Amino acid sequence: MSFSKESSRLFGFVAGIKFPKMIQKVINENYVKYFNINMSEFKAPCEYESLNALFTRTLQIPRKFEEGFISPSDGKILECGSTFLANEEHFAFSIKGHAYSVEELLKDSFEKDELKNGLDYVNIYLSPKDYHRYHSPCDMQILSATYTSGVLYSVNEKHLERISNLYVKNERVSLKCQNEKGIFWLVFVGAQNVGKMRFNFDASIQTNAKISHNFTRKYENLNFKKGEELGNFELGSTIVLISQKGLLTFNLKVGQGIKFGEKIAD
């Protein structure tokens, strides 16, 4: 078992402790202050019974959804573009100058023909200050979920520059989805500290577990409306959105902030 997973489970245990109310109030308020979190859409920091409850806070003011394909989460755009071919594999960038194999990222969640015309992608990084829940970016059907075991490196920009193939090395869950235009994937990449990802539609998907093995689960008639909640990270992480070529036209710039509900593609 890797040190990153052991340390993440320890951090998760501590984050889940419900301290006496006054102590928890101080912990939460200092966390909010340190990360400069805007709490205007959420309950007051003192109302969360643990640090993990603060991490996974729910919106108190519903977001309005813009027209088109919306961001599944809050975060920062780290990279956006089209894949390139090398040695008959499709490659994308985690960050400028650092490429990885899309086939390795997706593992068993694709058929070869689904990638033959190329792919477009966007990487959304969720920092510790961001809203940690993720949602359906459009009316869609989830066809399958593929769990791939791995380590839990931090996924911030500094580590992406230092560690090659980081997304491929980290634990992740890939959702294969379909809308009226075609196939796309939502890849939820685990990260150091806690490392937990939860999916509302399948509680049996367990991440950062002591015993783990790769698997794929297929679903029938698992439909979601645009904006419907899919699950949440515990602490920050990354969502990689990959679509068949021509399915989506991304209107994004690297480095820009994004909010769940805002349009990211036509």
Curated annotation (Swiss-Prot):
Residue numbers carrying Pyruvic acid (Ser): S237
Topology term for the membrane: Peripheral membrane protein
PTM statement from Swiss-Prot or TrEMBL: Is synthesized initially as an inactive proenzyme. Formation of the active enzyme involves a self-maturation process in which the active site pyruvoyl group is generated from an internal serine residue via an autocatalytic post-translational modification. Two non-identical subunits are generated from the proenzyme in this reaction, and the pyruvate is formed at the N-terminus of the alpha chain, which is derived from the carboxyl end of the proenzyme.
Pathway the protein takes part in: Phospholipid metabolism; phosphatidylethanolamine biosynthesis; phosphatidylethanolamine from CDP-diacylglycerol: step 2/2
Localization (cell): Cell membrane
Reaction it catalyzes: a 1,2-diacyl-sn-glycero-3-phospho-L-serine + H(+) = a 1,2-diacyl-sn-glycero-3-phosphoethanolamine + CO2
Active-site positions on this chain: D74, H135, S237
Record carries keyword Lyase: yes
InterPro entries for this protein: ERO1-like_sf, PS_Dcarbxylase, PSD-B, PSD_type1_pro
Cofactors named for this entry: pyruvate
Keywords: Cell membrane, Decarboxylase, Lipid biosynthesis, Lipid metabolism, Lyase, Membrane, Phospholipid biosynthesis, Phospholipid metabolism, Pyruvate, Zymogen
Pfam families tied to this protein: PS_Dcarbxylase
Enzyme class: lyase
The EC number(s) this enzyme carries: 4.1.1.65
Main localization (coarse): membrane
Site (Cleavage (non-hydrolytic)): G236, S237
Assigned GO CC terms: plasma membrane
Subunit and partners: Heterodimer of a large membrane-associated beta subunit and a small pyruvoyl-containing alpha subunit.
Record-stated family: Belongs to the phosphatidylserine decarboxylase family. PSD-B subfamily. Prokaryotic type I sub-subfamily.
NCBIfam families for this protein: PRK03934.1, PS_decarb
Role this protein plays: Catalyzes the formation of phosphatidylethanolamine (PtdEtn) from phosphatidylserine (PtdSer).
Database matches in PANTHER family: PHOSPHATIDYLSERINE DECARBOXYLASE (PTHR10067), PHOSPHATIDYLSERINE DECARBOXYLASE PROENZYME, MITOCHONDRIAL (PTHR10067:SF6)
Protein name: Phosphatidylserine decarboxylase proenzyme
Lineage: Bacteria, Pseudomonadati, Campylobacterota, Epsilonproteobacteria, Campylobacterales
